[in-house]
Swiss-Prot record:
It catalyses: K(+)(out) + ATP + H2O = K(+)(in) + ADP + phosphate + H(+). Belongs to the cation transport ATPase (P-type) (TC 3.A.3) family. Type IA subfamily. Mg(2+) binds at D518, D522. Gene3D superfamilies: Calcium-transporting ATPase, cytoplasmic domain N, Calcium-transporting ATPase, cytoplasmic transduction domain A, HAD superfamily/HAD-like. The active site is at D307 (4-aspartylphosphate intermediate). One of its GO terms (cellular component) is plasma membrane. ATP binds at D344, E348, F377, T378, A379, Q380, S381, R382, M383, S384, K395. Keywords: ATP-binding, Cell inner membrane, Cell membrane, Ion transport, Magnesium, Membrane, Metal-binding, Nucleotide-binding, Phosphoprotein, Potassium, Potassium transport, Translocase, Transmembrane, Transmembrane helix, Transport. This is Potassium-transporting ATPase ATP-binding subunit. NCBIfam families: ATPase_P-type, kdpB. Its EC number is 7.2.2.6. The lineage of its organism: Bacteria, Pseudomonadati, Pseudomonadota, Gammaproteobacteria, Enterobacterales. SUPFAM superfamilies: Calcium ATPase, transduction domain A (SSF81653), Calcium ATPase, transmembrane domain M (SSF81665), HAD-like (SSF56784), Metal cation-transporting ATPase, ATP-binding domain N (SSF81660).
Amino acid sequence: MSRKQLALFEPTLVVQALKEAVKKLNPQAQWRNPVMFIVWIGSLLTTCISIAMASGAMPGNALFSVAISGWLWVTVLFANFAEALAEGRSKAQANSLKGVKKTAFARKLREPKYGAAADKVPADQLRKGDIVLVEAGDIIPCDGEVIEGGASVDESAITGESAPVIRESGGDFASVTGGTRILSDWLVIECSVNPGETFLDRMIAMVEGAQRRKTPNEIALTILLIALTIVFLLATATLWPFSAWGGNAVSVTVLVALLVCLIPTTIGGLLSAIGVAGMSRMLGANVVATSGRAVEAAGDVDVLLLDKTGTITLGNRQASEFIPAQGVDEKTLADAAQLASLADETPEGRSIVILAKQRFNLRERDVQSLHATFVPFTAQSRMSGINIDNRMIRKGSVDAIRRHVEANGGHFPADVDQKVDQVARQGATPLVVVEGSRVLGVIALKDIVKGGIKERFAQLRKMGIKTVMITGDNRLTAAAIAAEAGVDDFLAEATPEAKLALIRQYQAEGRLVAMTGDGTNDAPALAQADVAVAMNSGTQAAKEAGNMVDLDSNPTKLIEVVHIGKQMLMTRGSLTTFSIANDVAKYFAIIPAAFAVTYPQLNALNIMRLHSPDSAILSAVIFNALIIVFLIPLALKGVSYKPLTASAMLRRNLWIYGLGGLLVPFIGIKVIDLLLTVCGLV
């Protein structure tokens, strides 16, 4: 579920952004953006010249100088406004989260158990390791792990999802978030963070941009822009002696205007806004990124590790067939399978009970009346079952049942091996049922591949992204599902160690890897991956290891995360192309105007036939300022993103933003020149 989206130019945000834009005129704020700092210095310089001309201390056209100075200040203000508006939208999202934080008291237990004596303490004084009790109606005071109890929790303040979730001790659903509310029952929680370090605190800080640092690509682009600025600065500085030698020195005001129009002010003014907006769009998708670096890395990802269950398949495997071993009746197999599944509360276990009922009218037995011992599934045994009336029935993976049979002195039938292979080749998961040391047969669990997922993987392949399915299934089953889903590769019988090794292997090849995870066993791989999206429903260890948290706990969101990252990189690249292409048109406007008196031959470059030198220079400066405002919506929303190959994407952007960057200034400057002339302002 996504949060309510703010209007692009929300009136209250615009007013606040205008105030912030004025505040950002101070040198300390301007110094952070070298390109706009040059414009700021130029504004100061031309302002001083305008004052000197107006007072008669310097010769020259004071009105023209004032106009140039004014529009240079407007250019700086517009750049500040773009950044302030992006930050304001993020802060508005953060303010909605701050409402979740409430000053409250917590019941700190003296001993780590329910019913122990408790002290009432302010929630903001809880430290890591403290034990607290929360009951129905209470706000959970800190991030932590449930060590006792189970409860229904309302997490809508964090996730935006109204449906309550169950949090209980043990397993992957023991993690709770401060600021959420208990709806029923009680929990004993061990705090896992100190004050100011909660997930909500970090979420607010990241959204507000308080910890936003420039990403590597942003730094590289900034260095390029600085280099271009220095080149144009040196080139402009040489023009004064060049024109003076020709007998008619160009004024400092004109040289400043020329410099400002030639340096890449458009992307320089919007660069910070693009980065802030990228993180804001990520939050709009209910994903919290810990840094801009994480969002940027998402755009560069070329390998996606995707969990099969819930991402590629619907995740609700259902029993579809009983396949008896040679000499075993199918009803006998179904009866044993149902008995072994009576205490199995997983969807797979329930489906086995239902299939036996549908096929052979085997009614569910009363669990209590059986006086049986149920054997739960464990990661070590990889099987479950029941001990009843001297019968030892187990169901589990092929390898686990094989070991069980051999340990009990039995022999695993060759025909069952063939049936297991047959089931696996069909893309189903085989479960083997055994009674004592006698193998009864195989249950086929069929998982359904999500509709449209194959087409999405084809789009990712076009973009040069490799998809790898991660599953605990055996190789045959994994291969069948991988072929049906259209993934490029798969990792079968995956363990935490195997996932970690696979990520390192891809990274050693120079690739960037993205993955999702929710369990403590996923933490090492999440920490190693370049883009690691932890599920909000997962453990605290997983959330700390990842660099993003999906509040919806939807593994499929990883594909959307990559799209948002690529859109941010495309936006930055497109606007950089547009900004640099702009310079060509502004060159044709200002150079002839500035030097036409000294070198009349340069009039040949006045292809726009602008009215006069003053109107040409002023029109270029005005266009240079206004284009920033017109591009703010594009910087905040991002350019239109389509899954294309890198070469096709480059061609598309060059046509739209390269050619557009050349043509738009010619049209814009000419229109402004006509308006200035018609209004008699030049």
